[in-house]
Amino acid sequence: MVADVLLTHFNQLFCLNDPGHPLTGQEMKKATIVEDGYIAIKDGLIVALGSGEPDAELVGTQTIMRSYKGKIATPGIIDCHTHLVYGGSREHEFAKKLAGVSYLDILAQGGGILSTVRATRSASFDNLYQKSKRLLDYMLLHGVTTVEAKSGYGLDWETEKRQLDVVAALEKDHPIDLVSTFMAAHAIPEEYKGNPKAYLDVIIKDMLPVVKEENLAEFCDIFCEKNVFTADESRYLLSKAKEMGFKLRIHADEIASIGGVDVAAELSAVSAEHLMMITDDGIAKLIGAGVIGNLLPATTFSLMEDTYAPARKMIDAGMAITLSTDSNPGSCPTANMQFVMQLGCFMLRLTPIEVLNAVTINAAYSVNRQERVGSLTVGKEADIAIFDAPNIDYPFYFFATNLIHQVYKKGQLTVDRGRIL
């Protein structure tokens, strides 16, 4: 077979034989590091990879040849938890945060999520589209090729649908692949204050059926937290969503452990998010139910909290984990997955191999794209992040700098030395 593109002489390729399930426990410590590696691409797919000189049959008169001495290649990075589409920003709350006002106290004062809800409700489709596109551009420049994007800053049907429509439009227009999550249960809207059940009924009866019918989202999520939605309320919504055919996620055990992990396990959610306050019993329940733990260390960093999710304990117990930005205007205003990956080492005490597995193959399973992306594997799409680094440890050791040299998306050179092509 003659390749369309042949990428050769990488210092290292980060490869993996996809086992057919998210990596758990000791599996997360394993990878195949190919020295002097090459990747052959045809019709947007990986058709061969190996070490040394490529087979002669891969090279034709039209084959594009590129050499990458001094560089490494990983699968395209996957950010599987973002709140991508929103209006406004919340830097005006930064002084309060520095003064020690808590996240929940800011929310109780009408700020936080509710502040962004007001800004998003007043924002036009074009405003939201352009703002979200800029964030996606930034992510792409940092090696991200697939992104999960939630609604949740409307808390009414008109605005929630506008957010989902923006995601759908960007999925068509932007190189990054987007996976949509419906999260109208992100907070209790002011017009339903004191009556969350009534709001959940509106979501179940009036919103979810339309989202499903119009194929606006693949996943449904809820914020199960003290002073937001209880475990029973979360179970009520997610069980109805599951009956309608949605895959499930749940924000759980971020600030307090109030039963969200139990709901995730009972309903076989794909993932439980945050988990800073998870208990040993909660870890065991998620492992037993096969729920992926999606950890968001940049949120803990941004909130200036001391308690990070117990990633080391989770992996050692046999759990599958992912790492994501939680990109949002309040608790985590970043879109930099390289920073998150570095926090995975510095604050969660994971190894570079564990982090790379978390943000590639496990993240692919988390967004239900494992058949297409998540590993440098023959037959998968050629989503490739190329780092200006001599080995896979270097991007973690040399932190706070964008080390992306190039990005390939579906076999096309999409980013070249800081420019989107």
From Swiss-Prot:
It catalyses: 4-imidazolone-5-propanoate + H2O = N-formimidoyl-L-glutamate. GO terms for cellular component: cytoplasm. Pathway: Amino-acid degradation; L-histidine degradation into L-glutamate; N-formimidoyl-L-glutamate from L-histidine: step 3/3. N-formimidoyl-L-glutamate binds at residues 153, 328, 330. It comes from the Bacteria. Binds 1 zinc or iron ion per subunit. GO terms for biological process: L-histidine catabolic process to glutamate and formamide; L-histidine catabolic process to glutamate and formate. Belongs to the metallo-dependent hydrolases superfamily. HutI family. Catalyzes the hydrolytic cleavage of the carbon-nitrogen bond in imidazolone-5-propanoate to yield N-formimidoyl-L-glutamate. It is the third step in the universal histidine degradation pathway. It is an enzyme of class 3 (hydrolase). Its main location: cytoplasm. This is Imidazolonepropionase. SUPFAM superfamilies: Composite domain of metallo-dependent hydrolases (SSF51338), Metallo-dependent hydrolases (SSF51556). HAMAP family: HutI. Fe(3+) binds at residues 81, 83, 251, 326. It comes from Streptococcus pyogenes serotype M1.
